[in-house]
Amino acid sequence: LGCERGLLVAGPFFFKSGLAEKVIKESEGMIVASFGDVSPNPDVAEVDACAEVIRQKNIGFVVALGGGSPMDCAKAAASVALTSDSIRKYHGIGVAMPEKHLPLIAVPTTAGTGSEVTCVSVLSDHANGKKAPIVSEGFYPAAAIIDPELTYTMPPQVTAGTGIDVLSHAIEGYWSKGHQPICDVLAMHAAELVFKYVYRAYRKPDDEEAREKMCEASLIAGLAFTLPKTTSSHACSFPLTN
């Protein structure tokens, strides 16, 4: 990417387990700061805090490690940090994000959200009881690194939950009013993979083929719904998970 001074954004587990420290060490000085205050449904306050780290540390690129929450937080922070704004200005009110953004490298550790290939960041504003997506062309990661081995340690309930999320993305992308033939093909392929492999991954976490195919399904489902967008199921989930 030709950038220096990276920021690692990851969930608290990665810092407690030592994995975040290992990633920073392996970067050989390219990653100079980290941010780990990311909750399962990232809050706008967390995005603003992450953006402030980017500003203060003169960050040139961002690495997001984890599930959809760190990736969504990093996407929004990497854009809003180049302004003096709070992300609240753009959250759920239809105000377009600025086009300028820092490069983002997404490294998913779950097979579920597909956030590594989408232009969407789903954020909560717990203080105001609101959860909504922000869509911006600047949210597309510059690179996505998909390593199925990173998903081996997912607990069975997380494997199941994220697997159903993949299926939901595929189905909603297919039945959305904005669907089109290419997205339909991707959606059907992703759904087929989920039906075939999610139970295997649930029952046997180290099943290499099942984990690889679920990562494939997650990425492809992300591509499938990016253009047509998700529908009623996700809309209903926002107040339930806020």
Name every feature range the model reports, one short phrase each.
Residues 1-7:
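N-terminal, positively charged, Ser/Thr/Ala/Gly-biased leader segments
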Residues 238-242:
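Catalytic phosphate/nucleotide-handling subdomain of diverse soluble enzymes
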Residues 120-228:
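Carboxylate- and glycine-rich phosphate/diphosphate-binding segment that chelates Mg2+/Mn2+
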Residues 45-146:
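Glycine/threonine-rich beta-strand-loop-alpha-helix active-site module
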Residues 15-85, 200-211:
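N-terminal small/polar loop signature for handling phosphorylated ligands or for N-terminal nucleophile
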Residues 230-237:
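Conserved catalytic block of serine-dependent lipid acyl chemistry
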